[in-house]
Amino acid sequence: MRRHKEVNFVAYLLFSLLVLVSAALAQNCGSQGGGKACASGQCCSKFGWCGNTNDYCGSGNCQSQCPGGGPGPGPGGDLGSAISNSMFDQMLKHRNENSCQGKNFYSYNAFINAARSFPGFGTSGDINARKREIAAFFAQTSHETTGGWASAPDGPYAWGYCFLRERGNPGDYCPPSSQWPCAPGRKYFGRGPIQISHNYNYGPCGRAIGVDLLNNPDLVATDPVISFKTALWFWMTPQSPKPSCHDVIIGRWNPSSADRAANRLPGFGVITNIINGGLECGRGTDNRVQDRIGFYRRYCSILGVTPGDNLDCVNQRWFGNALLVDTL
């Protein structure tokens, strides 16, 4: 009888542990969970867990879906109140030119619809923090998709989102991977706003947004909502040892002593380091870095917010290897 009770007790403990682990995994949210939302009525805590007590929803404890932080009157809730359709069109003024590969693909509605899957984006902090994040996101992605040149009409920084697919004759971007195996005949070159590339980025991104991008990578270039979601996923997802772009720009990231020794301080420059630091940072003045800053300053001006400090990564050391590698 005692042996029977011991077996039952062990089974109960194992069952309880599985329930707790399952619940914990299911509740991961916010920037720690790739921008996932909590169930209705719950808040996402600053640590990335869902709940409805003060530990999750209280002032200073909540990162998204906070009390009083529900959708506003605009079409995208708080996001729509920070960037209007007319601002979007002004920022990406020449995206629909005949010379642009992405003509009539990138739209305000697609952006707003995609952002609903990442409720912390453009809705965290005060209005200045929200606008600064939007400006930074569009600056970095505009650099990746720019069709501008020095003497372009309205200047080079009015030509973001001109391109959709990587130019030239890109390869298949398919290193061997047992976790993210490439589908026959598929290529994983740069597509969309962030120009996501490689099977090891398409795979986890697709899993996070609920789309099989390993078998259908060209959805990033044919479905505008999915296209924006891939860029937002990259923006919201930490890449250890890198923080997420989101956490940096809203001021949530606290650099370690190693970061400070590497001159990686909070600001737009660290985001460039996250995205393409191995090629652009710590190498002296770089035209690509300056191009990103040029877009950022223009968008901050349109949105009516100051750009903040530490805009370049000229003296920063690269973060090094990460869970996800650079998109380009």
Swiss-Prot record:
Belongs to the glycosyl hydrolase 19 family. Chitinase class I subfamily. Residues 322-328 form a propeptide. Its EC number is 3.2.1.14. This is Endochitinase. One of its GO terms (biological process) is cell wall macromolecule catabolic process. It is an enzyme of class 3 (hydrolase). It comes from the Eukaryota. Residues 1-26 form the signal peptide. It is found in: Vacuole. It catalyses: Random endo-hydrolysis of N-acetyl-beta-D-glucosaminide (1->4)-beta-linkages in chitin and chitodextrins. Keywords: Carbohydrate metabolism, Chitin degradation, Chitin-binding, Disulfide bond, Glycosidase, Hydrolase, Plant defense, Polysaccharide degradation, Signal, Vacuole. Residues 27-68 form the Chitin-binding type-1 domain. GO terms for cellular component: vacuole. PROSITE patterns: CHIT_BIND_I_1, CHIT_BIND_I_2, CHITINASE_19_1, CHITINASE_19_2. GO terms for molecular function: chitin binding; chitinase activity; endochitinase activity. The keyword Disulfide bond applies. Disulfide bonds join C29-C44, C38-C50, C43-C57, C62-C66, C100-C162, C174-C182, C281-C313. Defense against chitin-containing fungal pathogens. It holds the Pfam family Glyco_hydro_19. Its main location: other. Induction: By ethylene. The keyword Disulfide bond applies. The active site is at E144.
